C-alpha cells in the first residue's frame, strides 16, 4: 500500500492538540509533588499538632508522604485498567471530555486541603488525579493514533510524550521556591491543574470523534467519511474508508476480545507480550528513578544548586522528545527504541562509575551530570515516546481497547514499584544501583531486537495481519526476514 498523505491540516492539529492537554496533565502531576516536599511535610506536621497537640512522629510522617506520592500510581493503575469501559461505550473524544470532571474534583480537594487542615483531602486528590491520568494514558494515544494518517501516526503519536515532558518541566519550574513551591502557594501549585482541564473542555467539543470508532464500532459510515474529509483536508478519502472497512470485516469474523483472550489466543499473545515488555522497558529503564531522585543525585554529585540541574534535565527531556518527533517516521519505531535502550545502558554504566569514584575524584561530578543528561536524552529518543503509541499500532480496532488497558496497567504498576523500591535499593546498593537498570536495559534490547516488529508506514490491519499469519512459523524465520524495515506481513 502506498503511504498515506502527510498533509497536516488545522482540524487534525486541533484534535491532536486538544487530546494532548491530557498528556500535559499527566506529566505535571508526575513531577509536581517533588519540589514542595518539605513545605507539605510541614503542613502535615502542623495539621497533626492542631488535631492532637503534639508533633507528628517521623515514621508516621514518612508513611504519609510515601502514601501521598504512591497513591497517584495506584489511581493510575485503576484508571488505566478501566480504559476499555469508557472508549467503547462513549467514544474516544467523549471519554476524554468526561474525565475532566475528575481533574476538577482533584483540584478542589488539593487546593483547599490547607485551608481545611486536612491532609486526607490532599491524598484523596492525588488518588483521583491518578485515576484521571491512568485513563488519559489510554485515551490519548488511542485517539491520536486513530485520527492520524498512517504516514504521520508515529510523529503525531510522539506528541503524547511531548505533552508529558512539557508537563514535567512546567511542574519543575512552578515548583521553585520563588514561584509556587513555598509555604503560602503550594496549594495553588497542586490545584493549577484545573486550567488545562478547563481548556480541554473548551477545545474537545470542537474536535471530531475518531473516524475509526464511528465506522467500525458504530457503523456510521457517512459521519466517518465527513470527519475524514475534515481531518485530511481532502475530498477523496476512499482509501482510508476501504482500509477501515477491511478491518471491520476482519473484526466481525472474530469474537469479542477480552483481556484473558489476549493471552489465550495465539494471534494476540505475541503482540500483547511485545506491548507489555515495551511498557516495562519504559518504566524499568531507570528513568523514573532519575526523575524522582534527581535532586538528591545531583547533591551527591556535588552540584551547588541541584534544583536547577534538575530543571536542566527537564529541558533536555523536552528537546530530545522534539528530536524524536521529527525522526520517528524516517528511522522507524523499532530502530529508535533500540538506539535509546543502548544509549541509556551506556549512560547508566557511566553514571555508576562517576558516583562510585566521586569521593576520590571530585571532577567525576561533571561526568555524572553528563551521564544523567545523556540518559534522559536517549530515553526520549525511543523508550519514552514509542511504547505509548506503538501499543495502539500493534492491534486492530477490536482488541485495541483491551490491549491498551493491559499495557497501561503494566506501565503504571512498574512505575509504582520503582517509586516505592528505588530508595531502599539505592541505600542497599549505593552507587551501583544503576547496574541493575543496565542489566534490565540489555534484556529489553535483546527482546526488542528479536520480537518487536517495525510498524512504520503500515496500516493497523497490515500489522495485525502480520501477527495472524506469522504466529505459527516465527521460529523458522531469521531476524532479517521478520524485521526488514519495509516489513512483510509475517512480522512478529
Swiss-Prot record:
Q: Which GO terms describe its biological process?
A: D-glucose import; D-glucose transmembrane transport; dehydroascorbic acid transport; photoreceptor cell maintenance; protein-containing complex assembly; response to insulin
Query: In what way does this protein cross or attach to the membrane?
Result: Multi-pass membrane protein
Q: Which reaction does it catalyse?
A: D-glucose(out) = D-glucose(in)
The disulfides recorded in the entry are: none
Parts of the chain on the Cytoplasmic side: 1-11, 88-90, 145-155, 207-271, 329-334, 389-401, 451-492
Characterize the regulation of its activity: The uptake of glucose is inhibited by cytochalasin B. Glucose uptake is increased in response to phorbol ester 12-O-tetradecanoylphorbol-13-acetate (TPA) treatment: TPA-induced glucose uptake requires phosphorylation at Ser-226.
Query: What Pfam families does this protein's entry cite?
Result: Sugar_tr
* Superkingdom of source: Eukaryota
Q: How is it modified after translation?
A: Phosphorylation at Ser-226 by PKC promotes glucose uptake by increasing cell membrane localization.
* Record-level Gene Ontology MF annotations: D-glucose transmembrane transporter activity
List the Gene3D superfamilies hit by this protein, alphabetically: MFS general substrate transporter like domains (1.20.1250.20)
Q: Which residues lie on this side of the membrane: Extracellular?
A: 34-66, 113-120, 177-185, 294-306, 356-365, 423-429
Q: Which residues carry this modification: Phosphothreonine?
A: 478
GO cellular component labels: apical plasma membrane; basolateral plasma membrane; cortical actin cytoskeleton; photoreceptor inner segment; plasma membrane
Could you say which residues bind D-glucose here?
A: 161, 282-283, 288, 317, 380, 388
* Keyword hit for Transport: yes
List residues, modification N-acetylmethionine.
1
Transmembrane spans: 12-33, 67-87, 91-112, 121-144, 156-176, 186-206, 272-293, 307-328, 335-355, 366-388, 402-422, 430-450
**Record keywords: Transmembrane helix included?**
yes
Q: Which SUPFAM superfamilies match?
A: MFS general substrate transporter (SSF103473)
Q: Could you tell me what this protein does?
A: Facilitative glucose transporter, which is responsible for constitutive or basal glucose uptake. Has a very broad substrate specificity; can transport a wide range of aldoses including both pentoses and hexoses. Most important energy carrier of the brain: present at the blood-brain barrier and assures the energy-independent, facilitative transport of glucose into the brain. In association with BSG and NXNL1, promotes retinal cone survival by increasing glucose uptake into photoreceptors. Required for mesendoderm differentiation.
Q: Which family does it belong to?
A: Belongs to the major facilitator superfamily. Sugar transporter (TC 2.A.1.1) family. Glucose transporter subfamily.
User: What is the official name of this protein in its record?
Assistant: Solute carrier family 2, facilitated glucose transporter member 1
Q: What is the lineage of its organism?
A: Eukaryota, Metazoa, Chordata, Craniata, Vertebrata
Amino acid at each position: 500500500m502506498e503511504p498515506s498523505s502527510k498533509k497536516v491540516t488545522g482540524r487534525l492539529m486541533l484534535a491532536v492538540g486538544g487530546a494532548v492537554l491530557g498528556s500535559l496533565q499527566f506529566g505535571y502531576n508526575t513531577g509536581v509533588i517533588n519540589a514542595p516536599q518539605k513545605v507539605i511535610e510541614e503542613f502535615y506536621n502542623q495539621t497533626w499538632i492542631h488535631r492532637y497537640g503534639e508533633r507528628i512522629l517521623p515514621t508516621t510522617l514518612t508513611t504519609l508522604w510515601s502514601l501521598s506520592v504512591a497513591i497517584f500510581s495506584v489511581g493510575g493503575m485503576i484508571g488505566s485498567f478501566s480504559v476499555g469501559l469508557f472508549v467503547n461505550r462513549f467514544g474516544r473524544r467523549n471519554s476524554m471530555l468526561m474525565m475532566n470532571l475528575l481533574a476538577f474534583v482533584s483540584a478542589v480537594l488539593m487546593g483547599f486541603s490547607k485551608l481545611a487542615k486536612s491532609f486526607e483531602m490532599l491524598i484523596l486528590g492525588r488518588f483521583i488525579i491518578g485515576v484521571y491520568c491512568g485513563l488519559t494514558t489510554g485515551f490519548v494515544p488511542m485517539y491520536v493514533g486513530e485520527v492520524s494518517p498512517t504516514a504521520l501516526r508515529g510523529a503525531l503519536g510522539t506528541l503524547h510524550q511531548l505533552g508529558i515532558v512539557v508537563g514535567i518541566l512546567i511542574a519543575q519550574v512552578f515548583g521553585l521556591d520563588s514561584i509556587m513551591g513555598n509555604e503560602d502557594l503550594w496549594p495553588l501549585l497542586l490545584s493549577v491543574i484545573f486550567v488545562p482541564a478547563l481548556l480541554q473542555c473548551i477545545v474537545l467539543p470542537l474536535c471530531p470523534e475518531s473516524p475509526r470508532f464511528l465506522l467500525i464500532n458504530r457503523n456510521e459510515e457517512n459521519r466517518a467519511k465527513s470527519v475524514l474529509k475534515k481531518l485530511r483536508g481532502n475530498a477523496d478519502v476512499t482509501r482510508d474508508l476501504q482500509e477501515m472497512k477491511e478491518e471491520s470485516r476482519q473484526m466481525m469474523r472474530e469474537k469479542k476480545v477480552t483481556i484473558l483472550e489476549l493471552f489465550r489466543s495465539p494471534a494476540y499473545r505475541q503482540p500483547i507480550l511485545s506491548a507489555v515488555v515495551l511498557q516495562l522497558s519504559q518504566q524499568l529503564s531507570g528513568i523514573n528513578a532519575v526523575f524522582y531522585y534527581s535532586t538528591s543525585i545531583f547533591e551527591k554529585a556535588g552540584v551547588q544548586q541541584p534544583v536547577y540541574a534538575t530543571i536542566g534535565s527537564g529541558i533536555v527531556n523536552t528537546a530530545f522528545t522534539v528530536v524524536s518527533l521529527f525522526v520517528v517516521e524516517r528511522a522507524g519505531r523499532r530502530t529508535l527504541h533500540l538506539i535509546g535502550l543502548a544509549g541509556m545502558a551506556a549512560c547508566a554504566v557511566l553514571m555508576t562509575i562517576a558516583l562510585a569514584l566521586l569521593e576520590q575524584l571530585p571532577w567525576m561530578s561533571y561526568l555524572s551530570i553528563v551521564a544523567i543528561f545523556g540518559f534522559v536524552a536517549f530515553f526520549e529518543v525511543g523508550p519514552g515516546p514509542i511504547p505509548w503509541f506503538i501499543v495502539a499500532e500493534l492491534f486492530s480496532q477490536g482488541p485495541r481497547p483491551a490491549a491498551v488497558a493491559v499495557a497501561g496497567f503494566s506501565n503504571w504498576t512498574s512505575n509504582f514499584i520503582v517509586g516505592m523500591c528505588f530508595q531502599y535499593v539505592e541505600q542497599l546498593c549505593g552507587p551501583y544501583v544503576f547496574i541493575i537498570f543496565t542489566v534490565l536495559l540489555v534484556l529489553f534490547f535483546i527482546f526488542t531486537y528479536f520480537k518487536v516488529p517495525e510498524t512504520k508506514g503500515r496500516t493497523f490491519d497490515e500489522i495485525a495481519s502480520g501477527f495472524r499469519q506469522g504466529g505459527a512459523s516465527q521460529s523458522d524465520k531469521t531476524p532479517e526476514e521478520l524485521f526488514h524495515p519495509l516489513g512483510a506481513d509475517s512480522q512478529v
